[in-house]
Amino acid sequence: MLEVNLFGIKFKNPLILASGVVDMTPELLRRAHREGAGGVVTKSIGMEPRKGYENPTIVELPYGLINAMGLPNPGWEAFLEEFRKEKFDFPVIVSIFGGTPEEFAFLAEKLGEVADAFELNLSCPHAKGYGMEIGQKPENVYEVVKAVKDVTDKPVIAKLTPNVSDIRELGLAAEKAGADGVSAINTVKAIAIDIYAKRPILSNKFGGYSGPGVKPIALRAVYDLASSLDIPVIGIGGITTWQDAVEFLLAGASALQIGTAVYLRGFSVFREIAEGISRYLKEEGYSSVKEIIGLALKV
């Protein structure tokens, strides 16, 4: 009932662990799957090891988180050494980031043996020179996606920033370059200030906002992208309940990524949401989750 097929890859359900603030060891990826995730996305991997920013890197708010982790990762060589020893019985999407199209392509070439698909982090809002600074311009999105598609036969997903006037332009550029899908949204630019210290709370000052507060923004982005593109859209942003998940599916998302809810509530959210979607489908008379994808686009 919940199984979906994306880019020729089978997922037991449309719920995928998002790349983000949860540490991504192989054992934690397995735990996410045991707790109900249909697939996983790794931490974003770059050319060199990065320790990330000094604490504090996360601010908890009533309706989500602001984070500025600084893209901490072991670098591609250490990541490859660790993950090539592992065998996973579920889809593993490897997230990569770089400062140029050539760096993205290099990483895709090197990490192909441990990836079922690649997600291109074109949208991190707080790491200077990476992510959003590249991904805000459609021409840059096109160049990065094309460079990666030229060197790998693995499916390529472009992760898009919401910090633009029209996210559809980014999606269309990714599609034109040959992307197999897009994921949206990454976090929204944000800041939190300590009123007694009279300074920003995060060590980096600025961060990315995620969680329930961004859901309506994310839902609109998914709706717009699904209305405009012929490739699958993976919905991300504030999905916390099964009702949230159903909204994204109706808006045209072919699959969903969940991150902040895992940080706040634990891996059990995957099973809770999957069970809720199943109940909804039965109550509404559907035999497959595929039957409800995009229904709200037809109104």
Swiss-Prot record:
Could you name the active-site residues?
A: C124
Q: Which Pfam families match?
A: DHO_dh (PF01180)
User: Has UniProt tagged this entry with the keyword Flavoprotein?
Assistant: yes
Annotated residues that bind FMN are located at S19, K43, S44, N121, K159, I185, G211, G237, G238, G259, T260
Q: Which PANTHER family has this protein been placed in?
A: DIHYDROPYRIMIDINE DEHYDROGENASE [NADP(+)]
Q: Subunit structure, per the record?
A: Heterotetramer of 2 PyrK and 2 PyrD type B subunits.
Q: What is this protein called?
A: Dihydroorotate dehydrogenase B (NAD(+)), catalytic subunit
Gene designation per UniProt: pyrD
